[in-house]
Amino acid sequence: VHEHGHVVGDVNQNSFMVGRDSKVVLIDSDSFQINANGTLHLCEVGVSHFTPPELQTLSSFVGFERTENHDNFGLALLIFHVLFGGRHPYSGVPLISDAGNALETDITHFRYAYASDNQRRGLKPPPRSIPLSMLPSDVEAMFQQAFTESGVATGRPTAKAWVAALDLLRQQLKKCTVSAMHVYSAHLTDCPWCALDNQGVIYFIDLGEEVITTSGDFVLAKVWAMVMASVAPPALQL
């Protein structure tokens, strides 16, 4: 979408559909910000919980031009949801008096609960939640960049950066020796899912089935080359 000069704009959990074959499809495209033949058709809607901090104070998106970096905030949030069991990165245990009252306010003030400096920001992760340390340090740093002031100043991780980082993580997963349902990053010594199980927080019920990872012969670069080689349909004559 970005490579064609367009912006999704209203990025949220209802922007995508995932098929049984893991194919992801963008939907709700009638609200995209489209740049067509020099005319910019704006995206004038948005979901507050997915709106980046720098736009939280806007009373309306009418007449406002979105950017790729705004999209990249929503993308990082969706990835965080997937990796952390639906948890919102700006939701946690308040450390200061005015934190935790409204999600929009915490987003506005960059109160990323999992930040390396979260004590200063005023929120910390909820007890017995999935720890950020489950991820390699480079992926942790990408979330730090996406959800703090740095993302506004120097840009948030792009979709390409996320694809590369997560594909590398996929190739470095290892299986738990206790539960066939658990896989985790090879940088960890112990299984983080077992640690959560021992605290009474169970994400994966062990049914005796083995998790099949997608390492095999899958090569992302080859798949992406096929995607990029596809021919776009002709433009509509309106």
What are these model-derived regions, one by one?
Residues 2, 83-84, 147:
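Protein kinase-like catalytic domain
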Residues 135, 143-151, 163-170:
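C-lobe helix-loop cap of protein kinase catalytic domains
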Residues 40-60:
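Conserved activation segment of eukaryotic-like protein kinases, specifically the C-terminal portion
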Residues 36-38:
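Conserved catalytic-core motifs of eukaryotic protein kinase domains, centered on the activation segment
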Residues 28-33:
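Activation of the activation-loop gatekeeper triad in protein kinase-fold domains
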Residues 2-21:
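Catalytic-loop of the protein kinase fold
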Residues 66-72, 79-140:
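Conserved C-lobe activation region of Hanks-type protein kinase-like domains
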